[in-house]
Amino acid sequence: VREVLLLCWRDTGHPQGGGSERYLEQVGAQLTARGIKVTLRTAGYPGAPRRERIDGIDVSRAGGRYTVYPRALAALLLARIGLGPLRGVRPDAVIDTQNGIPFFAGVVTRAPSVVLVHHGHREQWPVAGRLVGRIGWWIESRLSPRVHRDNQYLTVSLPSAEELAALGVDNSRIAVVRNGAEPVPADAPTGAAETRTDEPTVVVLSRLVPHKQIEDALAAVARLRDRIPRLRLDVIGDGWWADNLKDNARELGIADAVTFHGHVDERRKHELLARAWVHVLPSRKEGWGLAVIEAAQHGVPTVGYRSSRGLTDSIVDGATGVLVDDVAQLADAVGELLDDPAARTVMGEKARSRAREFSWEQTGNGVYEVLAAAARGEHTAGLIAPRPVD
């Protein structure tokens, strides 16, 4: 494999970029470190240049939320005759990221396409409206599996692999390469007894969008406030749903206990995680839950929903965190951890130990294995978990 094309509806610089975009760009950076030429085609957004180079990746941007797809396909078609923004791009493999909707790159390119799916979007489509939601789910659940019936699939967790199989994708074509994690920055504190706040502090690290259900974290704090008067909640991240969440905090009477930090840099993010006692991730759906591992790097256990599917892979229930089924159980689990420092510390240290198992180098190596096999016309299946190259 000498050249790879990455297709994704957003990049990490996009105001709504998140964990799925981070996964793809980290993989791209690992591939460039191998000497592979990597191009990322994605959507534009205000202030973003049409072309730039980031971590060795050539980034090409055009289109918006929905037009990014046809414009990418048009660019691929033009590239075949030496025209357009992707002229000169001759990939040996393509990663076609399906965030609900794939690019269907295989229709216009001769290179083998690997379909990257972080998780299914059935629960998220209703936010787009009834008509768009029904069309989107039909594309994701019916059209895409049919069009890609011979393609390699790549996903980030075992539960997501099960979801793909339920949509009719053969298990023999589903490879799982889990997320990595970046080391805690050298200039940031690492979670320890001396970094924790004096007052009980819960942290949420997430994009602020409806399916992340941050309302449930607010509700849990409201339930616990009478019993734990000094309880604090730090919300790290931003998104178009932020104002609704701030209104919700006021309605619950806990605005004075909640700090919305918005987007922060890496050092500040880790500083906030290092001072927390418990991390809450109440998402309706997660492919993996990168925030679980980032909190774990600081010895902070996570409480999240079993129904999110992906968290059943990133959290070892009862060991590195707690899986629950509703907001009442969420509040109870958080309260129990806040009340029991010994149990919280043991669980946090187990989480920290597990976090050391994940690195972007390993993720990059695993994805390279999948791409190399696809370039040879072979399929890869199961959990791909290579150790770093010495």
Tell what function each PLM region has.
Residues 316-328, 336-342:
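Conserved acidic donor-binding segment of nucleotide-sugar-dependent glycosyltransferases
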Residues 159, 180:
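Carbohydrate-associated surface elements
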Residues 154, 190-221, 234:
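Conserved donor-binding/catalytic core segment of Leloir-type glycosyltransferases
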Residues 230, 343-357, 366:
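A short, well-ordered alpha-helix in the C-terminal region of glycosyltransferases
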Residues 246-264:
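Nucleotide-activated donor-binding/catalytic signature segment of Leloir-type glycosyltransferases, i.e.
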Residues 301-305:
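Short hydrophobic beta-strand element within catalytic cores of glycosyltransferases
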Residues 131-154, 162-163:
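Membrane-proximal helix-turn-helix segments that form the acceptor-binding/catalytic region
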Residues 284:
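Aromatic "clamp/platform" in nucleotide-sugar-dependent glycosyltransferases that forms part
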